[in-house]
Amino acid sequence: MASKRRSSLARVVPLRRARPEPAPAVATPENLNPYDFARLQFNRAADHLGLDPGIRDLLSQPKRQLTVSIPIRMDNKRVKVFTGYRVQHSIARGPSKGGIRFHPGVTLDEVKALAMWMTWKCAVVNIPFGGAKGGVTVDPKKLSMDENERLTRRYTSEISIILGHDRDIPAPDVYTTPQHMAWIMDTFSMTQGFSTLGVVTGKPIPLGGSAGRNEATAEGCFVAIEEAAKRMRLPLKGATAAVQGFGNAGSFVAKFLEEAGAKVVAVSDSRGGIYEKKGLRYDLITAAKEKKGTVTAARGQKISNAELLELPVDILVPAALEGAITRENAARVKAKIVAEAANGPTTPDADDILRSNGTVVIPDILANAGGVTVSYFEWVQDLYSFFWDPDVVRNHLEKTIRRAYEDVAETARRHDTDLRTGALILAVGRVEETTRLRGLFP
């Protein structure tokens, strides 16, 4: 790892569109669904910017949303129908970009929220994409490999009307892999009559994938942690850390922290966690995970995911799903730095509590932006058929995240607010500027 590794916002003619569905009758920040949660965050930033009501209305809802039925023939020869979604929040700054997740808890509101967050994430790191997200309501663990392939290909065919390297570019997300991306690329290419490598990122390297994409989210998160620690005068060597979630992002963050001399004392996955005050060894955890399917098979004191969040550590990395830190447990979070490798792991009420307790929260739209940053690099490489060495990818990623952190910190300082609100102010301001410059058609 190379390190040790306003524009002024003029008012415009109000832009009116149909209002989104109303929030629940009793809606506190803690019980909002993900989409209302995302809009609440957006509105806080919009208030700081004094955003024009028309622009606010436009950016608070998706540009396009597609719900599809996905019939596939199961291995037992019976037909089963799944529900899938693809939401494009904004294309003001370029093609829409965002992952596809296969999970039994996927809902339209969740996908809409994730698409909005992708818009802000791309704007924070200043890459020329808008935000999108996709998902299928399914438990992929209950599908065979052949069923996974048929589901992926049929889903791709259903949403292909809005895909394209210059329109909407998917990527891996929860329970989707480079193999799923290969199936998407191939299916879309068959409808075009030629290979279109740039229609999707996160692909296997032989199909136009980028070096460094697999660990990009974690590497970006680690660089953001470095920046936060530097500003707090917290040496990473000897610092303690806990990582909730040991998938792609969480496992690599743990690895990079260990390499920097930090002591990773706890990790967890969906089955629970382990704790060792003297520090866990990354190689032993991954070996246990590969052999038994869970980190709890490694040696260490068994703890729950909830207990992990409340450990007395310097750095906490929530790298699982949304809503891990809430008003119920936020006051018991003892970490000095919370680096959100997951999307939306901290609720608005919890954010307020952490802020009042002096915890530095590196928001998801900055902390986990490494993935989409290297996806952008992959897209560029595919368009030009010119592929970069791993060190080139790593250096560009590190430079991008450090510059983004500086931009966010400066915006937060200027507005006398926290990093999350600073990141949103920065991102919303950039999207507002391009929206205003483009104007309205017709």
Model-derived segments and spans:
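Glycine-rich phosphate/diphosphate-binding loop of Rossmann-like nucleotide-binding domains
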Residues: 204, 209-313
